[in-house]
Amino acid sequence: MSEAQLTTEPTDPHSLFRSWFAEAKASEPNDPEAMAVATVGADGQPSVRMVLLKGHDARGFVFYTNYESRKATQLLETGRAALLFHWKSLRRQVRIEGPVSKVSPEEGDAYFATRHRDSQIGAWASDQSRPLDSRATFEARYEEMLRRFEGGPVPRPPHWSGFRVAPERIEFWQDRAHRLHERRLFTRSGDGWSEGLLYP
């Protein structure tokens, strides 16, 4: 990373993330908000899957899921997660690690109300991560929920809401020629952040 970059890029990781995310939304052809969420179970087995970022501010990074899913079970067991954004068009990655907490019921309700009605119905129809005997069974449950909520609003299911990852470490990675990549690490320190570079 050049001295010019060090002095012109934001020194607050949340500001830097907003800057990079804005560039990704302008250049990434598919789902710039897609991120990998890594968790680990009580048995030590790691697990990873893609979700969509639905909120970001100084408190952390928010995504939504079924609280009875495998990912939610592991998050509630350990209270920690790692996130990864990979924007191929920019040849950049952002890695985030930290503790996890549930969003407030009010936040969950507000976000659920913005979802397309079909997605709201789907949240009621799916027993996420549980065995399914056939696609027909799932589709029948969906039709059942359509009838149940016909003509009225669809409330947020009690088992469906969000998690917030409060970052303790945020690393920004930029591809460079000759594998001389740039790695800029922010580590939470009290109410602020310490910053440094890493060898690639």
Curated annotation (Swiss-Prot):
HAMAP family associated with the record: PdxH (MF_01629)
Note on cofactor: Binds 1 FMN per subunit.
E.C. numbers: 1.4.3.5
GO molecular function list: FMN binding; pyridoxamine phosphate oxidase activity
GO biological process, one term: pyridoxine biosynthetic process
UniProt-recorded name of the protein: Pyridoxine/pyridoxamine 5'-phosphate oxidase
Cofactor(s) needed for function: FMN
Catalytic activity field: pyridoxamine 5'-phosphate + O2 + H2O = pyridoxal 5'-phosphate + H2O2 + NH4(+); pyridoxine 5'-phosphate + O2 = pyridoxal 5'-phosphate + H2O2
Organism from which the protein derives: Rhizorhabdus wittichii (strain DSM 6014 / CCUG 31198 / JCM 15750 / NBRC 105917 / EY 4224 / RW1)
InterPro entries given in the database record: Pyridox_Oxase, Pyridox_Oxase_CS, Pyridox_Oxase_N, Pyridoxamine_oxidase_dimer_C, Split_barrel_FMN-bd
Keywords: Flavoprotein, FMN, Oxidoreductase, Pyridoxine biosynthesis
Family: Belongs to the pyridoxamine 5'-phosphate oxidase family.
UniProt cross-references to PROSITE patterns, sorted A to Z: PYRIDOX_OXIDASE
Function statement: Catalyzes the oxidation of either pyridoxine 5'-phosphate (PNP) or pyridoxamine 5'-phosphate (PMP) into pyridoxal 5'-phosphate (PLP).
Pathway(s) of this molecule: Cofactor metabolism; pyridoxal 5'-phosphate salvage; pyridoxal 5'-phosphate from pyridoxamine 5'-phosphate: step 1/1; Cofactor metabolism; pyridoxal 5'-phosphate salvage; pyridoxal 5'-phosphate from pyridoxine 5'-phosphate: step 1/1
Gene: pdxH
Binding site for substrate: K54, Y111, R115, S119, R179, L180, H181
Taxonomic lineage of the native organism: Bacteria, Pseudomonadati, Pseudomonadota, Alphaproteobacteria, Sphingomonadales
Binding site residues for FMN: 49-54, 64-65, 70-71, 93, 128-129, 173, 183
Subunit composition and interactions: Homodimer.
Pfam families, alphabetized: PNP_phzG_C, PNPOx_N
